[in-house]
Regions:
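Phosphate-binding and adjacent anionic-ligand microenvironments
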Residues: 35-166
Length: 166
């Protein structure tokens, strides 16, 4: 956990990171197996949550980056679980805030029910790569033109502009 106990990163039995992106995915999979419903994560999170949610017959909803945005969307759609790809789990059954201790309890419950090592649990989920880089922009760069170029280039793919371009 981090110092204010709102994010959770896990390590498997072989010393490999479970991946903080997949903390929310695994915990959500467990919650959805017990309480069917919808999920929310911010746009800087893996697509794997969408896949797991749809597999469990729920609807995934993206939200702008920031806990306040995720919580607002969760309340709007009455999500059963949500969070951020940084290991922040929000479980409204208890409260609307990121909580690593809740994440630990839910993850360990999932692992106990799964009955196999954490590495095998992680292998159950689709593997996506997400690059989180900060790009320094100067005033003369035309962001709108760049975004339009990217939208055209990737027109065959779903495009989300809630918070930037994904």
């Amino acid at each position: 956990v981090d110092p204010d106990v709102d994010r959770l990163a896990l390590v498997s039995e072989n010393g490999e990171p479970f991946g903080e992106e997949y903390t929310l995915v695994a915990v959500s999979d467990y919650v959805l197996s017990k309480t069917p419903g919808n999920t929310v994560s911010n746009l800087s999170s893996t697509k794997a949550l969408k896949i797991v949610t749809e597999k469990r017959k729920g609807i995934y909803h993206p939200a702008a980056v920031g806990e306040v945005n995720v919580v607002a969307k969760m309340k709007e759609i009455t999500a059963v679980i949500g969070g951020e790809g940084n290991g922040g789990i929000i479980y409204p059954e208890l409260h609307y805030g990121r909580d690593a201790l809740v994440g630990i309890a839910l993850f360990l419950s999932h692992l106990a029910q799964f009955g196999r090592p954490a590495s095998m649990l992680r292998a159950q989920y689709p593997n996506y790569f997400i690059s989180k880089n900060k790009i320094e922009l100067t005033p003369e760069i035309n962001i709108d033109a760049i975004l339009e170029t990217l939208k055209k280039k990737y027109a065959k793919h779903p495009i989300n502009t809630i918070d930037g371009l994904k």
